[in-house]
């Protein structure tokens, strides 16, 4: 019987655009204040792209960063999966653009639309291709340019979102530091709690959809908050209990950076103290599929992430989509 192949994260790369949008900037744009934003979200600034920059541009930089860390060329990558809700265009897939621009000549791939859970979904997709033996080097990317679909006259959403990307390389593990388990869930009854109604086949782009501001994010904040707190905790408990762990065993909890109150409420349900949680939403805002790799990088830079650590990742996104992953850090 062949040995079971497990997948590990062998490299992590990230990128955010240099331009900052601070709470002070937003005070000049909408009726809000730094205190109001900080109390409700925990965000003090977010990075946003300059005009003409797209999701693939961020994803490319993150991918190159990961390759550089691993000492590999793009030609050695066999597949690329991109989690995003802000693709460069409806088609082709942003993964195709990334594949071409980084020079991954032999790679294939596709986009995954799971909103804030997009990186976790891309991570499992990539892991399964490694574990099946189909590929040895696969890249999972989470990237979004949320500023492209935000109405900067809507206080409820413009204070939350930012732009950013992260990429991880997955390879077969040679020790016990690998992706242990995943859990996923969708609940389509929450589709209208967080969505962009315009631009698809239901409401194709027209003068009317533009005038009605249908190409911007619409959110029921209270519904999202309640669902996210409950499901982020439930998904986390599932992967922990299924593998014989408790919250107290976790070295680092890496939640989707949606809102500081959501993060702390979910962590409280898991019995996790703040010194076991990485929170960088104050610096980057909610970058949708980019939040988890950016949070992993923040933890690494702070010296809070080392090889062998038990890491718990969890996210809830539009859809609703839910995802969690338990892993031993390997790089």
Give short role names for the model-derived ranges.
Residues 38-40, 44-57, 84-138, 268-296:
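Conserved catalytic cysteine-centered active-site region
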Residues 62-78, 234-251, 299-304:
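Phosphate/pyrophosphate-binding loops at sites that engage ATP/ADP/AMP, CoA/4′-phosphopantetheine
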């Amino acid at each position: 019987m062949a040995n079971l192949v497990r997948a590990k994260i062998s490299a992590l790369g990230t990128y955010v655009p240099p331009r900052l949008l601070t709470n002070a900037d937003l005070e000049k744009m909408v009726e809000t204040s730094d205190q109001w934003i900080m109390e409700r979200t925990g965000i003090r600034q977010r990075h946003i792209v300059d005009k003409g920059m797209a999701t693939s541009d961020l994803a490319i930089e993150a991918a190159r960063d990961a390759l550089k860390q691993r000492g590999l060329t793009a030609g050695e990558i066999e597949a690329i999966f991109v989690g995003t809700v802000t693709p460069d265009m409806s088609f082709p897939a942003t993964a195709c653009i990334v594949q071409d621009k980084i020079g991954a000549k032999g790679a294939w791939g596709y986009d995954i639309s799971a909103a804030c859970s997009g990186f976790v979904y891309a991570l499992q997709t990539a892991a399964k291709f490694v574990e099946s033996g189909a590929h040895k080097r696969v890249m999972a990317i989470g990237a979004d340019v949320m500023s492209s679909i935000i109405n900067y006259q809507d206080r409820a959403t413009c204070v939350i979102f930012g732009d950013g990307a992260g990429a991880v390389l997955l390879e077969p593990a040679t020790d016990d530091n690998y992706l242990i388990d995943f859990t996923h869930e969708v609940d389509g009854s929450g589709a209208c709690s967080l969505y962009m109604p315009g631009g698809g086949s239901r409401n194709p782009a027209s003068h009317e959809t533009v005038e009605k501001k249908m190409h911007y994010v619409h959110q029921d904040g209270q519904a999202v908050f309640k669902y996210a707190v409950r499901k982020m905790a439930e998904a986390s408990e599932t992967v922990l209990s299924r593998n014989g762990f408790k919250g107290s065993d976790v070295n680092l909890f890496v939640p989707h950076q949606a809102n500081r109150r959501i993060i702390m409420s979910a962590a409280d349900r898991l019995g996790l103290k703040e010194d076991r949680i990485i929170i960088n939403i104050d610096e980057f805002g909610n970058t949708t599929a980019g939040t988890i790799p950016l949070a992993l990088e923040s933890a690494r830079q702070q010296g809070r992430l080392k090889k062998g650590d038990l890491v718990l990742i969890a996210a809830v996104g539009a859809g609703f989509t839910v995802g969690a992953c338990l892993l031993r850090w390997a790089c």
